[in-house]
Amino acid sequence: MPQKTSKSKSSRTRYIEDSDDETRGRSRNRSIEKSRSRSLDKSQKKSRDKSLTRSRSKSPEKSKSRSKSLTRSRSKSPKKCITGNRKNSKHTKKDNEYTTEESDEESDDESDGETNEESDEELDNKSDGESDEEISEESDEEISEESDEDVPEEEYDDNDIRNIIIENINNEFARGKFGDFNVIIMKDNGFINATKLCKNAGSDFYHWKETKKAKELINELISSPGIKGDEVISTITGGKLTEIRGTYAHPKLIIQIAAWCSAEYALKVSDIVIEYHAKEAIEQKEKLLKKKDDKIDKLSKKIDEQKKEIKKLLEQGNEVLGYAKDTNRKINHVVNERVPYSDKPEIEHQLIIMKNNDKDKKQYKYSALRVMNKSKSSALSRYYKSHPKGNVILTIKYTPNSMHLWNECKDDLHKKKIKLSKKSSKFNLREDYTEKQLIKDIKKIHNARLQHPN
């Protein structure tokens, strides 16, 4: 009997342990399903947010394609969840079968439980990976489809008003940013919806159009070359797109309309115009300065050229002067045949060397008189008043020019043989130089210039 009771107790303990294992397996399956559903919800939210952000910048047709992709991803993900649940249900059946076995097989049950946990985790990872891959593939397909549907950007000139376009409405109209105004613009000509612009600023376009200033502007613009009357203002009515309805005005009129609507914009326009005129004035001043600089450069070039010419002329003049000096020197030494005697003896020159013989022994003992025949007597009388005891030691009765002859005598004798006065034609003999030598040298100089008969 005691043995039976022990067996019954052991069977009860095995039954309790088996039931505990069963509850553990069920709780584990529930936690796996919860974690898997959470991961799927997160992936669906991420894909939904991405698709929504793209749909905001695209047309309604593109949003439809993205909504289809979202529905596809939502419809696919539950299927994965169902397949995971089916696999988990299979594992729970196996766990229930293991609970009916004997307690001596508990070690096998524990190893099987661990493998079941690992297989469940692998299934979760696979299902999550497959759903993420599907979502990423679908999102990539959406992006490629959207990029193919984008309207190509058009290039305009730098001064074209259509550069303010930021997004297209369709092939004919687009949205743009005109200063602080959000505007609708025609793509073919750049006209801007004046009705919407005035309405956004709290004004009505027809009030501006009725003003005298508006009529003057429109008439002036119509009269401008290259602009037709029907090309200044255009009205769009009807159609499904209410956004594009209204009156569109030429860009030159839009600036005036915006200034009429908004005082702030009018002041901004004033600042721009002031800056433009200031720059224009500066450019004009710079042009004038440039013209003056160009004139100064031209004049300076002419001056430089004239300086070069003057330098050449000076060089040529110096050369001519050298030739003249050389010619004069040759004339002074010309031979007797080239200097004929004068036909008028009274104007012929004489050179007279006088010895002063003064009692007081003044500074200079000799004098040179350069006279013509007609003035010889008067010159000698003046000399004798100053030097009463003076006497003639040499007379050159004829010379073409007594001044030139005496100048040559001074050039040849004053350094080593005579000492000259700075104010007159008086002189002294240097040491070791006698009157005889003086007379001889003067005659030699005279004869070298002109060979006169004695």
Curated annotation (Swiss-Prot):
Q: Got any disulfides in this one, which pairs?
A: none
Which InterPro entries is this protein grouped with?
Answer: DUF3627, KilA/APSES_HTH, KilA_N
What residue stretches are annotated with the KilA-N domain? Answer: 172-276
Sequence ranges of Basic residues compositional bias: 1-12, 65-79
Sequence ranges of Acidic residues compositional bias = 98-123, 130-158
Checking PROSITE patterns in the record gives: KILA_N
Q: Where is this region: Disordered?
A: 1-159
What spans are recorded as compositionally biased (Basic and acidic residues)? 14-64
Q: Where are the transmembrane segments?
A: none
> What protein name applies here?
Putative KilA-N domain-containing protein L4
Its lineage opens with: Viruses, Varidnaviria, Bamfordvirae, Nucleocytoviricota, Megaviricetes
